[in-house]
Amino acid sequence: MQWAGVGMWMVFGLSACSPTKTEIGNLNVIPQPQEVSQDIQAHPFVINPQTGIVYPEGNEKLQRTAEFLASYIKEATGITVRTTTEAAKKNSIILAVDSSITNKEGYQLEVTSENIHLNGGSESGVFYGMQTLYKALPLTKNKQVSAAIPVGTVNDYPRFGYRGFMVDVGRHYFPVSYLKQIIDMLALHNINYFHWHLTEDQGWRIEIKKYPKLTEIGSIRPRTLIDRETQTYDETPHSGFYTQEEAKEIVKYAADRFITVIPEVDLPGHMMGALVSYPELGCTGGPYEIPCKWGVFPDVLCGGNDRALQFAKDVLNEIMDIF
């Protein structure tokens, strides 16, 4: 998968059909597949209410991928298609795992005027191929316009095994709904790791049941620096944290899209959110304050403090139960 520009939509009319016009998408998507060949002169694969997305019976991951694709088709074209385990018929999109594809995240896509075959080296490969199909769809909800995929083939696999994106919620909290939108965008671009920066000097954002003050106190800062040169603050409290159930919800949401969540808890530095909540964990005993500006701060968890070492173990035990 390489990064490159996306092609333009193409439209042509079919006088004998109703709707009166067919809009064809483009297999040249972002990230750019390794190999793409399409024939825009050939009669395309036309999506209609009789289109079926076929997946192997008993394969829950491919069932979920089929359901994703059906929802994406509905979103892009307004057309409702069905998912099924029945034998493939004409006008089907057929999902399958092919062990001969050596790269587990790779896939092969073949589009004819009658059917689409999508084979992946594993379920994740099928998922990435499905995302290519999604991006290849024309955006049309006009009942007078049919949506179609051009005849062609795609052979694709990732250049990098680790494709990550980091979100820092320690300095600025984002709600669960927004994180899900980010994960959807990551899935769309074949990203497979979500790096979740959960704690910072400026705020502790994950519930730790053994240490409730981390979120009762450590998640709140009274104001935030908005102009470094003039040292202007917004005078608005900033807060927010994720319960363990919400964190598990994010982990599952990402996993359903073949994205692994990597939690980050900084220590022994970047720990003012914890020291404000539990001053006895520091080297001086405090008092400590949540920083309202950015930078490096000298106070850290005290490595020679047995309570600090136990704190680190307790926190990581709860984090590992979530992730």
Predicted segments, located by residue:
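Compositionally biased, intrinsically disordered low-complexity segments
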Residues: W9, G13-S15, Q50, E114, ...
